[in-house]
Amino acid sequence: MSQIVDFVEDKDSRNDASIQIIDGPSNVEIIALSESMDQDECKRAHVSSAEMIPSSPQRKSVSNDVENVDLNKSIELSAPFFQDISISKLDDFSTTVNSIIDSSLRNENNAKGNAKKLLDDLISDEWSADLESSGKKHNKSQYNLRDIAEKWGVQSLKNPEPIAVDCEYKTQGIGKTNSDISDSPKSQIGAADILFDFPLSPVKHENPTEEKHNSIANENSSPDNSLKPAGKQNHGEDGTSMAKRVYNKGEDEQEHLPKGKKRTIALSRTLINSTKLPDTVELNLSKFLDSSDSITTDVLSTPAKGSNIVRTGSQPIFSNANCFQEAKRSKTLTAEDPKCTKNTAREVSQLENYIAYGQYYTREDSKNKIRHLLKENKNAFKRVNQIYRDNIKARSQMIIEFSPSLLQLFKKGDSDLQQQLAPAVVQSSYNDSMPLLRFLRKCDSIYDFSNDFYYPCDPKIVEENVLILYYDAQEFFEQYTSQKKELYRKIRFFSKNGKHVILILSDINKLKRAIFQLENEKYKARVEQRLSGTEEALRPRSKKSSQVGKLGIKKFDLEQRLRFIDREWHVKIHTVNSHMEFINSLPNLVSLIGKQRMDPAIRYMKYAHLNVKSAQDSTETLKKTFHQIGRMPEMKANNVVSLYPSFQSLLEDIEKGRLQSDNEGKYLMTEAVEKRLYKLFTCTDPNDTIE
């Protein structure tokens, strides 16, 4: 029962007052004529015979031949949602094919007296209530067909096919349409399935009957339809006949119901159809994970399930019949992979930059090695794991390597470099291209990064990650001005290889004074020139002053460039005023580098910010507590500890509400310290502060 609805839009009125409905075998299409006759011609067109085609600006004779139909200056628009147009007066389908309707869209009184309309059959139950309510609310509104077409994104067809108007269509159109629709798969779906009724894809013109509403298909596919060929009535009866009969029975029962109840029934059908069990797929998450991720593959893999288990959409993916299973550690977690430990522990991965000569051992290898050392060489194992705090012992393992030119420069001074750095060894390097200081270590143990143990080994000399570049400040900025790229490349060579570069600039204050003096001389010369009008001859400068003038750096620019180099060149700049100042500070630097390998603050970097030092006994711990809480002096803390040697003894008197006095009969502590101690011992809130 597909038909072509031909809408003729008047140019003057711009409304939907004149509408012509013509049955045809194609999809529902809208033909909006760019020009139309005026209202007088429209009235004469309604009185004309049923064989007349839609009116045009020029009145022509009409015949039944398809070629004589004038469709010039018309735009053919495909509108699959033509039911949204509220048309209140339509002609009966059984009277004639080309009958013309002369009624207004806003006339509801005449619509009540008409017989059953064509669009009433086309519109389904769920849409009829919307049309009725929308017609009451917007009875005075007018619809523009072009706006409706643009609203639904309908595109115009360049070559519209002519409308075939002949007598054979009257007898064959209905039977042909019914047979096509009954064979379509749309007749097997409920009327309230909107996704099938109005697909998101564009309308296909090859098979137009599949785009019709489901109500048309269900009405025309009934077994009582006499216009349907006999050969196609039994087609598909094995799979869908029962569903068709149930649906047609429900349609017959709903004919006498009002439209509001019809919509309620249609919505209930939609709810029933939507509550069907969805198609579920059992996911195996191990196929979605990377094979290299050995930690999560065994843990997150979906367990195998029986084929009789049906999961609905409300059940979780990881649901299992046995919810209370015994917690088991994954095999990959017990394997103790060194690389896995390196990646998961952040502080362990950073130890390589500070602790030289180390290796990653598994837990089993570590246990076997410790068991063997405790049997064979127990004293050596204890010795290499002992933490030393003496600076002399820390320097005993160090070797300081100077470049030849730098070592010769430091030996010119009055101090003995070897004596100041003893017991460290001072030696000269073979490369004199850069003023470089390297720190070497004599290692007799190897460090276990994974288990935090030192194992005795054969002596070996390794290089520390810290090195020093020593430059005179003026020479450095001369290279920075003339050979900046080469200087940057040399410094970045070390920092890219994981070295911590310390850039020492000597005589930086002397350079600042030379730059300031040069700027002051230039300023005085400009002032005297403006006052006297004659240029005064500059005083002869020394060779070093002339070299400073060639730098072209101001005092303010010098500070800015130092900050830029420190930030962008990945170095740490340290300035000294003379060579002797650096030589005197070098022993302390060597001691710090010597302690670095066994420093607990570096090995336990995660807790280094706490800055907590352990005490020898409980009495010393209580004494440090007094100092941290009330800044109590050491002598006064000793008096308190002599009477209360432990926390328990002090807590007993605090609970009693009285404290002992000292030997002179005075208070042991001030009132503020007593309040803080009382709060420390009795407070139950861990987030509370001691004021």
Curated annotation (Swiss-Prot):
It is an enzyme of class 3 (hydrolase). Pfam families: ERCC4 (PF02732). The modification N-acetylserine is found at residue 2. Residues 203-214 have a biased composition (Basic and acidic residues). The keyword NAD does not apply. Its EC number is 3.1.22.-. CDD domains: XPF_nuclease_EME-like. Optimum pH is 8.0 for cleavage of a 3'-flap structure. Its cofactor is Mg(2+); Mn(2+). The modification Phosphoserine is found at residues 48-49, 61. Residues 364-391, 507-529 form a coiled coil. Keywords: Acetylation, Coiled coil, DNA damage, DNA recombination, DNA repair, Endonuclease, Hydrolase, Magnesium, Manganese, Meiosis, Metal-binding, Nuclease, Nucleus, Phosphoprotein. Residues 201-240 are annotated as: Disordered. GO terms for biological process: DNA damage response; DNA repair; DNA topological change; double-strand break repair; mitotic intra-S DNA damage checkpoint signaling; reciprocal meiotic recombination; regulation of reciprocal meiotic recombination; replication fork processing. Residues 598-691 are annotated as: Interaction with MUS81. The keyword Cell membrane does not apply. Residues 215-225 have a biased composition (Polar residues). GO terms for molecular function: DNA binding; endonuclease activity; metal ion binding. It is found in: Nucleus. GO terms for cellular component: Holliday junction resolvase complex; nucleus. Belongs to the EME1/MMS4 family. Two distinct classes of meiotic crossovers have been demonstrated in budding yeast. Class I crossovers exhibit crossover interference and require MSH4 and MSH5 for their resolution, while class II crossovers exhibit no crossover interference and require MUS81 and MMS4. While class I crossovers represent the majority of crossovers in S.cerevisiae, they are virtually absent in S.pombe which lacks orthologs of MSH4 and MSH5. Interacts with MUS81. Interacts with MUS81 to form a DNA structure-specific endonuclease with substrate preference for branched DNA structures with a 5'-end at the branch nick. Typical substrates include 3'-flap structures, D-loops, replication forks with regressed leading strands and nicked Holliday junctions. Cleavage probably occurs approximately half a helical turn upstream of the free 5'-end in these structures. This is Crossover junction endonuclease MMS4. It comes from Saccharomyces cerevisiae (strain ATCC 204508 / S288c). The lineage of its organism: Eukaryota, Fungi, Dikarya, Ascomycota, Saccharomycotina.
